[in-house]
A protein has these predicted regions:
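C-terminal all-alpha effector/ligand-binding and dimerization domain
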Residues: 129-137, 167-234
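Short linear motifs at protein or domain termini
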Residues: 1-107, 114, 232-233
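All-alpha effector-binding/dimerization core of bacterial HTH-type transcriptional repressors
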Residues: 76-152, 194-214
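Short loop-to-helix capping motifs
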Residues: 34, 161-163, 206-207
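Flexible, glycine- and charge-enriched loops at secondary-structure boundaries
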Residues: 3, 7-10, 121, 142, ...
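Short basic (Lys/Arg) and small-residue
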Residues: 156
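Hydrophobic/aromatic residues within well-ordered alpha-helical segments
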Residues: 9, 13, 104-108, 124, ...
């Protein structure tokens, strides 16, 4: 039976290496050999192998006999994994990742808003209103306003009544944090209350078309902002 200490050490190494992989430390150099890693971290081979297994389960690395361990391309990473998502948030600014996150939101959130208008789950809709009211109340506090904005959008996923949307909460939550934080910085202000209220009002009225369009409007504006900053960097 593996000791709790061994598992704890392996997890700590996995976190350190995983963060280094996702933030690009090994983009220009190969992934270290097992011996190099053991020397660097002062860990046993058993513990290091366990850490690498954890990284492999997240899609970050792959190991082949006589070829060693290599970092996998981003498309093979498990982007639904909470650790991978957290590390992605620590990457240097990347137009591509912000654009892709916002595109994903555009594919999901307007449909969720339309479904919420159709389902009419009163408790879930009340949670959306709570999110909007929190956005208004925290308008002068950037961090609190950001969290309220996230809560608003996540509440819409719940109100959709679609369990698959709700299961995407960890991914959507991080996508929201990344994209909203960026667009707030670009625009110079926190989220527009009126545009968010338009989504809520449409949902409360049961107007699925208006709810979908209001959600799309916010996200398309976010895409424009991201494309603008990308153009300025080129």
């Amino acid at each position: 039976m593996r000791s709790e200490l061994g598992v704890s050490l392996a997890y700590g190494l996995m976190r350190s290496l995983g963060q280094s992989i996702v933030t690009g430390e090994f983009e220009t150099v190969g992934f270290p050999t097992e011996a190099e890693l053991c020397t660097k971290f002062g860990a046993s081979r058993t513990v290091m192998r366990e850490a690498v297994k954890m990284l492999s389960a997240k899609g970050l690395v792959s190991s082949r006999q006589r070829q060693g361990t290599r970092v996998e391309p981003v498309e093979n990473w498990n982007l639904l994994d909470p650790d991978v998502l957290r590390w992605l948030m620590e990457r240097p600014f990347s137009n591509k990742i912000f654009l892709e996150f916002t595109q994903m939101r555009l594919a999901i959130e307007p449909t969720a808003a339309a479904l919420a208008a159709q389902v009419q789950d009163k408790l879930a809709i009340a949670a959306i209103r709570e999110g909007l009211e929190a956005m208004i109340a925290t308008a002068g506090d950037q961090d609190a306003a950001l969290q309220a904005d996230i809560d608003f959008h996540v509440a819409i996923l719940k109100a959709s009544g679609n369990p698959f949307f709700w299961r995407l909460k960890p991914l959507i939550n991080n996508a929201l944090r990344l994209s909203i934080e960026l667009t707030n910085k670009i625009s110079g202000h926190t989220a527009d209350i009126a545009s968010h209220e338009a989504i809520l009002v449409a949902i409360e009225k049961g107007d699925a078309v208006a709810a979908e369009q209001a959600s799309e409007s916010i996200l398309k504006e976010s895409l424009k902002l991201i494309e603008t900053i990308a153009a300025l960097k080129n």
